[in-house]
């Protein structure tokens, strides 16, 4: 009986509120995108992380490429990406990503990856090669990289910095108190150090991070996380609603659904605190409409 009541409560809390409703996406465009990725042997975080915006983004011909395979060396409790023994590094992958960027004629592209603790540089070199290949084929395309923490290895961070992406993103994900439970193989302070070190290595690169709400955090904890990110030199912040990828024991359950009004409050607060750009809403994800954040940062430094 207790188990049945728990399952019922879980079902109720995971019943999506009305503000999650979206327009039906362009099915033909989505199929074209899927065919392109399959033929190029490429992965997208859109699919692997089961992003709720996939239909909208793919319908507009936009996607976030995920390099270094689709199996992560870590098993964060919020993430839908497969965890286990990572795949072999594909030396042709950077070129295939660049070809896809060219075929889609992207003005702005986001490159992310699984964590690769099994590699000496934890995947930094593959990021660099991917940036270089895109620069060769699409020199005007702006590039954002969404990186794992590379265990805060300075040499790995330096490699990526020297490749000159326009934006470097690393997600802190949640408040300090919840971090050990939500992402046990990561570390809250290490994530802050990664962002801070990127700024030290190249102050001209915009840095970015993301926070999920609905994991049991308090308003005070969200505001403290904002303060911590600002102290680390973070320019861009995205805030979205956590949605459990599955009902399995691996994944944390949703504790609460945050209203659009609360998201609006956090956006206003973040801008007042000093972030150059804040995108905050139930469906916001770290790579969602990423170009907008980059453009706003550019405008603000020109003022």
Kindly give the residue locations of the regions a language model identified:
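Small/polar loops that bind or transfer phosphate-bearing groups
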Residues: 67-68, 145, 170, 280
